[in-house]
């Protein structure tokens, strides 16, 4: 008997490419769909868009920002989600005070690079802090990441930054 469909939710500036290496294993006995957040600028909007396109019941896996979207899906429609996997994410809102301002400043600095020099230039900066140093010499991996980012625009990056900086506290979702 086939399993319920699996919806894969990519992270910040990511798309289907982040899930491609896993799809052969994940798609065994089930239909897999990778969502696109479009120009949505809130996690709740991203979650609602996912729910609007999703089947009545499904499994869910989210990576990074995508896992935060998955938490919002569970908050909005827990009865529709059979199981959920949250990968490399957090659940707390942006910190108050200096820590929160520092997070915003770092995100806006990357946005400025994307707007002034292009998304690829921003991705080249981003990859240095997000890919393990031992893998930075893997030209194929780094190029896949850069190509993935360049399929998005600075406007999409701005919308996703807004979504992350205004993220809700998901502690209650995890407790339930």
List the predicted regions and their residue ranges.
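Conserved HGGG/HGGXW glycine-rich cap/lid loop of the alpha/beta-hydrolase fold
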Residues: 1-47, 58-59
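Active-site acidic short loop of glycosyltransferases
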Residues: 3, 54-56, 79, 176
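Active-site signature of alpha/beta-hydrolase-fold catalytic machinery across serine-
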Residues: 21, 49, 72-76
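Conserved alpha/beta-hydrolase catalytic His-Asp/Glu region
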Residues: 98-102, 116-175
């Amino acid at each position: 008997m086939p399993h319920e469909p699996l919806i894969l939710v990519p992270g910040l500036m990511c798309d289907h490419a982040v899930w491609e290496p896993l799809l052969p294993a994940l798609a065994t006995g089930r239909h897999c769909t990778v969502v696109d957040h479009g120009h949505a600028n809130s996690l709740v909007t991203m979650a609602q868009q996912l729910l609007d396109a999703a089947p009545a019941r499904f499994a869910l896996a989210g990576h990074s920002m995508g896992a935060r979207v998955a938490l919002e899906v569970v908050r909005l429609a827990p009865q529709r989600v059979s199981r959920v996997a949250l990968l490399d994410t957090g659940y707390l809102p942006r910190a108050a005070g200096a820590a929160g301002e520092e997070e915003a400043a770092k995100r806006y600095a990357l946005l400025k690079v994307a707007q002034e020099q292009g998304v690829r230039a921003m991705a080249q900066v981003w990859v240095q802090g997000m890919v393990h140093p031992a893998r930075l010499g893997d030209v194929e991996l780094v190029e896949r990441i850069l190509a993935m980012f360049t399929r998005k625009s600075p406007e999409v990056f701005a919308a996703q930054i807004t979504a992350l900086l205004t993220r809700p506290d998901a502690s209650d979702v995890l407790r339930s």
